UniProtKB/Swiss-Prot annotation:
Lumazine-binding repeats lie at residues 1-101, 102-198. It comes from Brucella abortus (strain 2308). 2,4-dihydroxypteridine 1 binds at residues 4-6, 149-151, 163-168. Its EC number is 2.5.1.9. Each monomer can bind two substrate molecules, yet there is only one active site for the whole trimeric enzyme, which is located at the interface between two neighboring chains and formed by the N-terminal barrel from chain A and the C-terminal barrel from chain B. GO terms for molecular function: riboflavin binding; riboflavin synthase activity. This is Riboflavin synthase. InterPro entries: ATP_synth_asu-like_sf, Lumazine-bd, Lumazine-bd_dom, Riboflavin_synthase-like_b-brl. Keywords: Repeat, Riboflavin biosynthesis, Transferase. Catalyzes the dismutation of two molecules of 6,7-dimethyl-8-ribityllumazine, resulting in the formation of riboflavin and 5-amino-6-(D-ribitylamino)uracil. Pathway: Cofactor biosynthesis; riboflavin biosynthesis; riboflavin from 2-hydroxy-3-oxobutyl phosphate and 5-amino-6-(D-ribitylamino)uracil: step 2/2. The keyword Metal-binding does not apply. 2,4-dihydroxypteridine 2 binds at residues 47-49, 66-68, 105-107, 140. It holds the Pfam family Lum_binding.
Length: 202
């Protein structure tokens, strides 16, 4: 599990096609000595498993992960190319601060940025969610976008908006996001459970 608090901006170094998937090498500021094979790292919100690391004693800082058919179909990974910057977060450990909300790294689909608007020291992004996910997005609720835990400020049909302060723009890839871009979206699990419960109470 994750918290939606981004701890590094990684960069895609290489993309190697596999049978029904891809192998991604991600450059990172994380110390590879602190990463174990099999560890989970959220890459722009997608929970991926580390399958390779630099040799011990190497000054290189990267890790490799594999993404398969479902991830390529549901997420933005299918469009990733060498040089792309991505949000990174390592998995939650016992005792870690819970700064955002519980994020599982199981992306539900892609949302499209409709508008980016400066508002004083912050930036408001309006996004369009897939129709099937719209019922789970509520004002003042939580949503994970490219792995970032954000609060929904307003909702209008399948469009919603979020506000990011300048610091958040600087420590995530959101500073580069613009209208027309697509981002990974994971709806709040509590919203999913509430909807499921309501369905059975009808």
């Amino acid at each position: 599990m994750f918290t939606g608090i981004i701890t590094d901006i990684g960069k895609v170094d290489r993309v190697k096609p596999l049978n029904e998937g891809v192998l991604l090498r991600i450059e990172t500021a994380y110390d590879p000595e602190t990463i174990e094979l099999g560890a989970s790292i959220a890459c722009s919100g997608v929970c991926l498993t580390v399958v390779a690391l630099p040799e011990k004693g190497s000054n290189a800082r990267w890790f490799e992960v594999e993404a398969w058919e479902e991830a390529l179909r549901l997420t933005t990974i299918s469009s990733w190319q060498s040089g792309r910057k991505i949000n990174l977060e390592r998995s939650l450990k016992l005792g870690d601060e819970m700064g955002g909300h519980l994020v599982f790294g199981h992306v539900d689909g892609q949302a499209e940025i409709v508008e980016r608007k400066d508002e004083g020291d912050a930036v408001r992004f309006t996004l369009r969610a897939p129709e099937e996910l719209a019922p789970f997005i509520a004002q003042k609720g939580s949503v994970a976008l490219d792995g970032t835990s954000l609060t929904v400020n307003g909702v209008n049909a399948n469009e919603f908006d979020v506000l990011l302060i300048r610091h958040s723009l600087e420590v995530t890839t959101w500073g580069e996001r613009k209208a027309g871009d697509k981002v990974n979206i994971e709806i709040d699990q509590l919203a999913r459970y509430a909807a499921r419960l309501a369905q059975y109470q009808k």
